[in-house]
Amino acid sequence: MPVFGNATDIRFNGISATKAYLNNNVAWQLTNYSAGLYKTTYAGYHNETPSFFATATLTTYGANPATSVQTTAISEPSSDDGSNFSVQWLGYFKPTTTETYTLYISSDDGSYLWIGANALSGFTTANANINNGGAHGSVEVSTTISLTAGTYYPIRMQFGEIGGGDVFTFNYSTPTISKTTNVTGLVFYNPTTNGF
């Protein structure tokens, strides 16, 4: 857990970091990280319960340093037949410009996104920046947030599939950046702790 005091230089889960407060959220300036988000896949649907991932059966794991964060017709364990699984991505989002970002998630079925302090702890469906929960066809939900260039914001995304199609796509846009899935150079994770 981060230390919420007056110190500016700390060690955070084995990563050197500098604390900064922005828009009532805690952000971190990381000095040790790897490109991508840390992705884990679990057996079973999360049932709109963010804590599901703490005790669920892990099926695959590893960094996902792709240029975009997508799950479309993904390969899943044969025991799940690709119809009953959940995925979580952990890491940091580092904006390239200081402005208002619109973050989007399209999913089939339920998905959630937290960015800032709630991504680290205390995350619930009620405080999710994006709540696209429930069993449904492909639906897009968005949120806007003011972000500062070069600051590493904790980000957590969760997705679940419970039958039918399986789609998860993360996009972002700003007044100066057209809507895109390309997160090259914007997402990072802690290689020591596999996430934060």
Model-derived features: where do they sit?
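Intrinsically disordered, compositionally biased repeat/linker segments
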Residues: 1-30
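Acidic/polar, compositionally biased interaction segments
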Residues: 31-196
